[in-house]
């Protein structure tokens, strides 16, 4: 048996099983993310939320997914059918593909590569193409204009996200996500984590993640309270479901990055409790709860306000933070407190 797993066939089978496990975990989480999102929103508005299908409404997401799947796929006249169907599939698969390098525990990662951060950015940057393709292939000017606005929004906030992560890379001296989590280790639990020295960037990263995922209050392209759905206006049935799934998976990816970069990943917040994958899941769900609460309580921004805050506030702040962290690391200024965080751990 050991010889089989060491052979190319065994390696291929191992990668296949790991890939299926990642897909099962993310898609299983997706079902309860949609349910939790609706329940939290309902609680803030003093409603019950989903409560009909299954106990406590737990099967409501399955019923909604089935409803989308059995509906007719209406293709607009003159649409590019190949690109029309490729766009939602591409959006979902790229978001799912990024989880290949996400470690849930020590050794619990499908591909423990040294450029994990770059891999995630490459995958997330390509998601813009799915949005553009979906708007263009619909053969309608309104979805196409919405896709351009959405692409501009996503690209704008990717710049800030990248600069924020550069600060973490300087502090840890690595782009390997497992190494970044290991750099959080220490005798003081959560006080050793990078949220403390990089606290302003935690706030900027969270808000930028909202804009990157088209989540409220930055859901200007496909606001749920409006009559149209932005670049997805001409989509229905399963393709529309794939677009929705891609957005939730991308949001879950941002929750994972927040947990790994700033909050110790699978490390325990207190030294006397064992580390484990459950801490990673708890932290991801905490950040998802924060995403849902923002959706429920924060009013929507105008598009000009969204772009202004991205380019005139977040970009200068994140760039200035990179310069500050680089200076502290290079000259070992403020040794003691910053020596632990700004000189490669």
Swiss-Prot record:
Principal cellular location given in the protein's record: membrane
Subcellular location(s) of the protein: Cell inner membrane
Topological type in the membrane: Multi-pass membrane protein
Keywords of this entry: Cell inner membrane, Cell membrane, Membrane, NAD, Quinone, Translocase, Transmembrane, Transmembrane helix, Ubiquinone
Leading EC class: translocase
Superkingdom to which the source organism belongs: Bacteria
Listed EC numbers: 7.1.1.-
Family: Belongs to the complex I subunit 1 family.
HAMAP family, per the entry: NDH1_NuoH
Role noted for this protein: NDH-1 shuttles electrons from NADH, via FMN and iron-sulfur (Fe-S) centers, to quinones in the respiratory chain. The immediate electron acceptor for the enzyme in this species is believed to be ubiquinone. Couples the redox reaction to proton translocation (for every two electrons transferred, four hydrogen ions are translocated across the cytoplasmic membrane), and thus conserves the redox energy in a proton gradient.
Protein name (database record): NADH-quinone oxidoreductase subunit 8
